Amino acid sequence: MKVLISSPCSASVIIQYGIKSWPIWECEPSKFQWNYDDKEICLIIEGRAKISTQNGAIYVIKAGDLVEFPAGLNCEWEVTKSIKKHYRLGS
């Protein structure tokens, strides 16, 4: 399973999808396991994290990135700089 990253996310995409009205999630530097039961699309507002998947892929996400996590993904998050994101679950 692949994590898709669009960097930087354009202002037109933010407006088109109404991203600024999506809920916000925040996390201090930490390391934890996460399983995505549903697809998630998120816009990283602040911070940085390293995402390591079970198949050995490593992704670094940062402020300005639009990220899509597929349903069924199991991964480890390592938040290296306090992160804040708008997110939407499902299709």
Residue ranges, per PLM feature:
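Short histidine-centered beta-strand/loop micro-motifs
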Residues: 16, 32-36, 53, 59-60, ...
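Short hydrophobic/aromatic-rich beta-strand segments that constitute the beta-sheet cores
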Residues: 34, 51, 85-87
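Short acidic-glycine-tyrosine-enriched beta hairpin
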Residues: 55-71
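Double-stranded beta-helix
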Residues: 1-3, 7, 21, 84-91
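Short, conserved beta-strand element in jelly-roll/cupin
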Residues: 36-51
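Ligand-binding loop in jelly-roll beta-barrel domains
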Residues: 71-91
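Conserved short histidine dyad/triad with adjacent acidic residue
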Residues: 8-10, 18-37, 70-71
